[in-house]
Design a protein with these regions (language model features):
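A short, Lys/Arg-rich alpha-helix, primarily the initiator
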Residues: 1-17
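The alpha-helix within a helix-turn-helix
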Residues: 12, 23, 52
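Residue-level detection of the helix-turn-helix DNA-binding "recognition helix"
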Residues: 13, 27, 38-40, 67
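Short alpha-helical DNA-recognition segment
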Residues: 17-35
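DNA major-groove recognition helix of helix-turn-helix/homeodomain DNA-binding modules
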Residues: 46-61
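Short amphipathic recognition helices of helix-turn-helix/homeodomain-type DNA-binding modules
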Residues: 61-78
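Mid-protein regulatory/catalytic core that forms ligand/cofactor-binding pockets
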Residues: 96, 101-175
């Protein structure tokens, strides 16, 4: 059952109605309402507006819930696909029985940059905000110095439009070492 379906069902129960009563009141087939509640059919604009009117909800509330649920589902699917691709290239060789839920966002971003291709990297920008990806890249990868230097130059130029990437990378690395020395 979808979240929207659960919400509609709770509104029906809390109001002391049954699906047949609501369907009759708003002029739709009970089976259509049942399919939406069960999550087997998407909520249409006219039906959403009728339900919102009947239950005195804000306009767009049900459609917003439906859209948010679809975005969440899409992002979970995308993350699972990226983890699957990483498993195919043996990026998690030291892990046993790993799933998408086990991988932190930081680790996923780092592994995708290191092990996967441009098309997969582009998917990161659908999953996460650009600033978050840049922060993870800067905190986890840039500080590794020469080990990932060429990759980091490409990432700096291609994804973050950094004009002088070599200088930028050296500066971030120096700042990181300075922090380590100051806190030692």
């Amino acid at each position: 059952m979808s979240e929207v379906g659960q919400h509609i069902e709770s509104l029906i129960k809390n109001g002391g109605y049954c699906q047949s009563d609501i369907a009759r009141e708003i002029g739709v087939h009970r089976q259509s309402l049942s399919y939406i509640i069960a999550g087997r059919r998407e909520l249409s604009m006219p039906l959403a507006l009728k339900l919102e009117s009947f239950f005195n909800l804000h306009e767009g509330e049900l459609l917003k819930k439906q859209a948010e649920e679809r975005v969440r589902y899409y992002k979970q699917k995308l993350k699972s696909e990226l983890v699957e691709r990483l498993l195919e290239v043996n990026a998690f060789w030291s892990y046993a029985g790993i799933s998408a839920e086990d991988i932190s966002d930081d680790e996923l971003i780092e592994k995708v940059f290191i092990h996967l291709d441009l098309a997969d990297i582009a998917k990161l920008f659908e999953l996460y905000q650009r600033d978050f990806i840049r922060k993870v890249w800067k905190d986890k990868m840039v500080i590794q110095g020469d080990y990932l230097f060429n990759l980091n130059v490409m990432i700096a130029l291609f994804y973050f439009n950094i004009k002088r990437p070599e200088k930028y990378l050296r500066q971030v690395e120096r700042e990181h070492f300075k922090k380590l020395v100051d806190h030692a």
